[in-house]
Regions:
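Single conserved hydrophobic/aromatic residue that forms the stacking wall/gate
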Residues: 1-7, 11
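Beta-strand-loop-alpha-helix segment that lines the small-molecule cofactor/substrate pocket
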Residues: 10, 98-99, 103-151, 165
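N-terminal Rossmann-like dinucleotide-binding module
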Residues: 12-70, 149-152
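NAD(P)-dependent dehydrogenases' Rossmann-like dinucleotide-binding region
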Residues: 35, 166-174
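Conserved SAM-binding strand-loop segment of SAM-dependent methyltransferases
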Residues: 74-78
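Short amphipathic alpha-helix with an adjacent loop that forms part of the alpha/beta core around
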Residues: 81-88
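N-terminal Rossmann-like NAD(P) cofactor-binding module of classical short-chain dehydrogenase/reductase
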Residues: 93-94
């Protein structure tokens, strides 16, 4: 129940409040991004109303576009160093790294009490999944696994077109 309520609060804040009314600088989340290029770029670009305070990527060249977009964010190559230096300044973390690093980065973030958005796959085995589930409950944080097919703007846009009658009668979808 707690997670449903907390997730609902975060959803309302992310979707309704900022998009309709703007977000006060005093009410912005301080977000750290781990994995800045590629899929990471698509993820951090979805939270323009929040405050990106740290960015971490082992591939500095690939991350350069994101780094330049947030000149005030502190830059790191190692997420462990980022957490050591900045954990008190971070509210939530976006993790868009290669699959094999999801568990380690997520667990450190949870242990520090940070809310976490993790790209799919969430984990490599059932033990990691159960450990993450227990950690989210224990540390009372909100977590979400991203699945780009369901979290990108395109799907929402098509739904709006359908609801507005722009598409007409839909007979078949592939």
């Amino acid at each position: 129940q707690h997670h449903s309520s907390a997730a609902s609060d975060v959803y309302k804040r992310q979707v309704f409040i900022p998009s309709l009314f703007g977000n006060s600088p005093n009410n912005r989340l301080n977000i750290a991004v781990i994995g800045v290029g590629g899929r990471g770029r698509a993820n951090w670009s979805q939270v323009p109303q929040e405050n990106i305070v740290a960015m971490c990527d082992v591939d500095q060249k690939r991350a350069s576009r994101g780094f330049s977009k947030f000149p005030n964010a502190k830059k790191f190559k190692d997420f462990r160093v980022m957490f050591d230096k900045m954990s008190n300044e971070i509210d939530a973390v976006i993790i868009s790294t290669p699959d094999h690093t999801h568990f380690a980065a997520t667990m450190i973030a949870m242990e520090l009490g940070k809310h976490v958005y993790v790209e799919k796959p969430l984990a490599h085995n059932v033990w990691e999944l159960r450990t993450m589930k227990k950690a989210a409950k224990y540390y009372k944080i909100v977590s979400q696994m991203g699945n780009q097919g369901h979290t990108t703007e395109g799907l929402r846009l098509i739904k709006e077109w359908y609801d507005a009658g722009v598409l007409g009668d839909v007979k078949e979808v592939h």
